[in-house]
A protein has these predicted regions:
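Short beta-strand-to-loop acidic/aromatic patch adjacent to the donor-nucleotide binding site
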Residues: 135-147
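Short beta-strand/loop segment that forms part of the nucleotide-sugar
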Residues: 61-73, 92-98
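Short beta-strand/turn micro-motifs composed of small residues
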Residues: 37-39, 69-71, 140-143
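Short, charged/polar "capping" segments at the starts of alpha-helices
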Residues: 45, 72-79
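Conserved donor-nucleotide/metal-binding helix-loop-beta segment in metal-dependent transferases, i.e.
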Residues: 149-170
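Active-site-proximal specificity loops/subdomain of glycosyltransferases
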Residues: 14-15, 76-136
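N-proximal low-complexity "stem/linker" segments adjacent to membrane-targeting elements
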Residues: 1-58
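Structural beta-sheet core signal
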Residues: 35-37, 65-67, 170
């Protein structure tokens, strides 16, 4: 779900948030919730990812953050892990195009299912969802290049999914 697509929206600011960060954190702790951010290594050199990290740094109660990262090297992955090292919840940096993933996907292809696909954010999302869903009932997805990302974004995305009284269920 994305609420920053101009005229086309799926979840926007419907006034569901009560601007009570304590209550929101309690909701997060009642239902295991993860955030997934598909991202290219180049995005770590841009301001948006820093805004996202800053906004999420106060979000205790989150089960995990999954960064589905397209990177050129293990050093890039280590740099991404270091970038998110101080978060108040577990962060898993998944190397979407790393050797282990490529080997796994090639072995699946040999069995007759070609899931190699062209690398990109869509491919990263599918991989990241598998990881995020291991420990979470609710998964929110944000792009890594949202230049207006702020502290209200996680609540606006997740509150309708966390509270069944809003009438949104999957």
């Amino acid at each position: 779900m994305d609420f920053q697509q101009g005229l086309i929206t799926t979840i926007h600011d419907y006034g569901l948030g009560n601007n009570d960060p304590v209550a929101f954190r309690q909701e997060l702790s009642r239902r295991p919730t993860a955030l997934l951010i598909p991202c290219l290594m180049e995005e770590f050199g841009r301001p948006a990812i820093k805004l996202i990290r800053e906004a999420l740094s106060d979000l205790s109660g989150l089960q995990s953050l999954v960064i589905a990262l397209a990177a050129d090297s293990a050093e890039d992955v280590a740099a991404a892990e270091q970038f998110f090292a101080e978060m108040p919840f577990p962060v898993h940096v998944h190397w979407t195009n790393g050797p282990a993933v490529r080997e796994l996907l090639l072995s699946v292809k040999e069995l007759g299912l070609d899931v190699m696909g062209p690398p990109g954010k869509g491919w990263a999302v599918w991989q990241g969802l598998g990881i995020a869903c291991q420990d979470a009932e609710v998964v929110g997805l944000f792009d890594a290049d949202i230049r207006t990302f702020g502290p209200s974004y996680p609540e606006r995305m997740l509150r309708p999914l966390l509270d069944p009284s809003h009438g949104i269920a999957y």
